[in-house]
Amino acid sequence: MELIKSRLLSEGSVWHIGSLSAVYLSQGLSGGTLFALTTYLVSIGASVKDISLLLSITMIPWTLKIFLGPIIDSFTLNRFGRRRFWILISQVAMMLAVMPLVFIEVSEVNFLLICLLTAHNAFVAVSDISVDALAADSLNADQMANANGFMWGSKTLGRGIGMALATSIFFSYGVNEGFLILIILMSTAFIFPLFSEELSYKAGQQNESYKNRLTLGELIAGVSASMFNRSAFAAMIFMLFANIGYGIFDVIYNEFYIEELGWSGEEIGYLRPFGMWLGGLIGLSAGLLTIYFQKRLLLLLFITGQGLVFLAASTFDPSTPTWMTSMAIIGVDAVDAGWSVLIFSILMALCTTNTSATNFGIFMGFGNISMLIGNNIAPYILGAGDYSFAFVFAALSLIPCWLTGYYLTRS
């Protein structure tokens, strides 16, 4: 009985936070491997349009989280746990989707590669919204900032580990071996949700046990109670603009650094993980920092920091010192992790009903649409000007986030 209790996902225990973080770590490993893959493909001849196409299409499942939420809220098998059921299914499917990449040659952006990575991302999206809903359901309000720090920190650390390992393996051995290592690492992280136990009720609502299904009326009522207010509207505006600049950066930075600044793909692939690891540490500490500093100050500081990284990149040319161009690659992920942890704790606090997957999925759907917009407009922004113009545009796209972030962190 004591062993089962120790694996119960409640009260912010070590196992509770560790299990949530393990799922996030798995998602980070996947994302880091994709970052390394785009760098590798650019280094062997892929264009900005190729990378834009790859990232845009593989991002589509993330934008559909708005529609995945109601499904995850409405259907489950409580014997496996309301959210854990979906986490287990999606984690297994994530690994199966990339299994073919262990065997087929990957030397360009093509239809098969796009299809496999899109399927993989679809299951990652299901896992993501399920674990977010699990966190919103199982954590008390005063635990969310700290837990989000560990969760997002783990995801960012996972990205760094995934990108560093994949870069080394892609350039030294090949893409097939890189995806084999990814599957092995995701299988290891899968142990935590596999052996966990989930509460049968939302934290703080012990008298209302979960049901296997929610009716349409219950779903609509739950969404309405959480989403029809000014704070939720401001949060949606924030998320709609949050990732446009990051999406532009991800599409163009490889070509910019390789063709304009004279870097190699391996140099990029080895350096960027340091920013992700720094972001992981910032993410882990961001929740704790809110104890000593106002959340508003920290959120606006990180948003401003990301804008400054983009503006700095707009000034780079071949004569720019290497330490300065290196700081931009490191900084973009470091500051992104900081504001992400803070805004996600705010979003989870807005999910006050049993429709957490739908509520959080709406917020994250807007965030992923934002990334999709950035990925898609990057070639056109670059075509309308130059790299400097594209980076300035990325910085300016953060202005609505600064304004809505100020509103969301009011006392």
Annotate each predicted stretch with a short phrase:
Residues E2-S13, S200-A234:
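Juxtamembrane intracellular "pre-TM" segments in multi-pass secondary transporters
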Residues F35-D50, V251-I268:
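Short amphipathic helix-loop junctions that connect adjacent transmembrane helices
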Residues V48-S52, A141-F150, G265-E266, C351-F363:
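Loop-to-transmembrane helix entry/capping segments in MFS-fold secondary transporters
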Residues I87-S107, T304-S319:
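C-terminal ends and interior cores of transmembrane alpha-helices
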Residues A125-L139, G338-T352:
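Intracellular juxtamembrane helix-capping segments at the cytosolic ends
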Residues R296-I343:
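C-terminal transmembrane helical hairpin of 12-TM major facilitator-type secondary transporters
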Residues N354-L382:
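A late C-terminal transmembrane helix in Major Facilitator Superfamily
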